[in-house]
Amino acid sequence: MDDLTLLDLLECPVCFEKLDVTAKVLPCQHTFCKPCLQRIFKAHKELRCPECRTLVFCSIEALPANLLLVRLLDGVRSGHNSWRGGSFRRPRILTLQDNRKAKSSPRSLQASPFRLGPTVRIHMDGVPRAKALCNYRGKNPGDLKFNKGDVILLQRQLDENWYQGEINGVSGFFPASSVEVIKQLPQPPPLCRALYNFDLRDKDKSENQDCLTFLKDDVITVISRVDENWAEGKLGDKVGIFPILFVEPNLSARHLLEKSKGHQLSRTKHLSLMSSPSRGKATNTSTLRKSPGSRRKGSGQFAMTTALNTLNRMVHSPEGHQMVEISTPVLISSTSPSMLTQHGDRADFPASSAGQVSTSHPAPASPGHSTAMVSVPSSQQHLSTNMFVALHTYSAQGPEELDLKKGEGIRVLGKNQDGWLRGVSLVTGRTGIFPSDYVIPVFSSTARKTSSFPDSRHPTVCTTWALSTSSVSSQGSFSEGDPRQSGPFRSVFVPTAVNPPRSTSGPGTSGQGSLRKVRSSMRKNGSLQRPVQSGIPTFMVGSLRCSPAMVIRPQKFQFYQPQGMTPSPTPIMVEIGSKSISTGEPALTCINRGGKTRTHSAGNSIIMEGKETPIKSEPPPKPPASAPPSILVKPENSKNGIEKQVKTVRFQNYSPPPTKHSASGPTSGKHEQPATLKGSQPEAVSSEGEMTILFAHRSGCHSGQQTDLRRKSAFSKTTPPVSTASVSQTLFPSK
């Protein structure tokens, strides 16, 4: 084959012109002349391969030249034929025939391929190549075989441990540890592919003008890292910041993000310490202009960082540390990972749908952990499909696997194979596969099964993640039916270890009481925990969420004893009032036999019933006949300042157990006549007494009943309602 025939084969497939050294090879290994590529890019505003339609992400100038074409052209121009016997041989490769000719004729050295050595060496200086450190025979069919000392032309880098190269016209894969890289491959541009839609056109443009909007499968050029969860990138002619969890970076972009992570974090912390409370005045304009983190208008603008950090703090909270109460409402826009969809649907939500991240702590009798309630909008209910928590520690067995630590949060991206999942760690940010039996869904309904009390000596309370349509204003008012919110209320429970609370029963209590029923009729969508073990105080968790502006003060307890009366074993005073606070909710305060208080806040009513079986069967001592015990029921003053009449309740001897009463709402201002329970003969030993406290909401829509069976015989008397604003009925047993 002569030189003219060779030049006829070297033509561009598009324009059929002769190829020269300026021809560029695309990532799909197709070669075209530079003018054709420029015309394609100018016409379509993007560069795709004319044959296979593969999209090219880099510029035309950054494309490499075809090394084989360059060598062929150099050989033709120098007058040396590189084709011998119908087979192509690389320059600088000494064959056995050339070696014999070199020994027989010294002049043949001038015509041997080694005369091309200086020319080829000058060209090879810019070619990515590596030198073999050992013999490698390969284990798979696609592996490259070479000997120690061979020079391998590098084609591309698969990952940190594998290369694809060529030697003697044969291409294959080989490990990076078996070669020494002489000339590194040109690094591909740091690019990332969008996994989800990120569009903020419906939000406030003034706050989100620095965000880079994109759609799924868009390719973004990474410029730098802003902070732990945000990066700066370029898409077309637009430059802005975007959440890192929304994209999948390539190897170059991953190295760039990891390299600048520590520097950007330290820089952000330094700027946050130097920033003054008045952010309107830029004291250090040059520093803020250089920092990409200064583009964020405020700490509450992007809630994705806040949501992730809140989840990590709840997952990794130490057992001896109580959760901090978060009271500031956080705007959860579409930048939150909870807005992510599995199939790339557009995440369009109302601009005004805001959620309040708050924690509610009921006050137990003894110090310890309390129930935390975190509320987010109901539009993010699909967050339950991909949020998991590691149950056990797992060490990765391969490079594609993900290390897990107990309690670590993971966002699952999909199933890899049977028994394996693929996800990204919310702590390290790494992506990999892991066994499915090592994790549990955070927002799964099956987590409710774990919210039980395994032992009365080691009780636990449940952390409630409530997805509710209700809203609590900063003044603590409870509203419902907001048109901006929709979806049912649901709660999921995550067990949290707590310290055992003290027993609320006094020393005179014989036996343990079991709380049978705890119900809370708060509006329409209340959620309630039901204890399943005995001897455990009830922690009431409902749909009512109290903001820090709501203050619930326990009523003061006073001891009252009538004149000319022997001291009663348990003389107490109970005040039941619906104090007019900003929430419009009644506060029920009662005192136990041991003098310890329990305060509950209810939306409308609370019903508690308890039964206790006495150990001893002997009858209780009768109270003195001269002075029966009495209890003063003092109603609270209403809003208009009108004082209500103080009622005194006296006990009747040996009255039967009173039946349950329901306090109906007042319909008029007339006082009802008290219904006196007639006394009867004492029943057998099995008869039990009960103490009933009835109270009603101010509006009179609901009523509550609290029953505590502590003694065997009961003395009761009903008290009429004192006003239209409050209905109180107190029934107490004597000792």
UniProtKB/Swiss-Prot annotation:
GO cellular component: nucleoplasm; nucleus
Post-translational modification: Autoubiquitinated.
Metabolic or biological pathway, per its Swiss-Prot or TrEMBL entry: Protein modification; protein ubiquitination
Record's compositionally biased regions (Pro residues): 617-627
GO molecular function terms listed in the Swiss-Prot or TrEMBL record: phosphatase binding; protein phosphatase 1 binding; protein phosphatase inhibitor activity; ubiquitin protein ligase activity; zinc ion binding
Listed InterPro entries: Endophilin_SH3RF, SH3-like_dom_sf, SH3_domain, SH3RF2_RING-HC_Zfn, SH3RF2_SH3_1, SH3RF2_SH3_2, SH3RF2_SH3_3, Znf_RING
Catalytic activity: S-ubiquitinyl-[E2 ubiquitin-conjugating enzyme]-L-cysteine + [acceptor protein]-L-lysine = [E2 ubiquitin-conjugating enzyme]-L-cysteine + N(6)-ubiquitinyl-[acceptor protein]-L-lysine
Matching Pfam families: SH3_1 (PF00018), SH3_2 (PF07653), zf-RING_2 (PF13639)
Keywords recorded for this protein, A-Z: Metal-binding, Nucleus, Phosphoprotein, Protein phosphatase inhibitor, Repeat, SH3 domain, Transferase, Ubl conjugation, Ubl conjugation pathway, Zinc, Zinc-finger
Residue ranges constituting the SH3 domain according to the UniProt record: 125-184, 187-252, 383-444
Compartment(s) of residence: Nucleus
Subunit structure: Interacts with FASLG and PPP1CA. Interacts with PAK4 and TNFRSF1A. Interacts with DLK1, MAP3K10, MAPK8IP1/JIP1, MAPK8IP2/JIP2 and MAPK8IP3/JIP3. Interacts with RAC1 (both active GTP- or inactive GDP-bound forms).
Described function: Has E3 ubiquitin-protein ligase activity. Acts as an anti-apoptotic regulator of the JNK pathway by ubiquitinating and promoting the degradation of SH3RF1, a scaffold protein that is required for pro-apoptotic JNK activation. Facilitates TNF-alpha-mediated recruitment of adapter proteins TRADD and RIPK1 to TNFRSF1A and regulates PAK4 protein stability via inhibition of its ubiquitin-mediated proteasomal degradation. Inhibits PPP1CA phosphatase activity.
Protein name according to UniProt: E3 ubiquitin-protein ligase SH3RF2
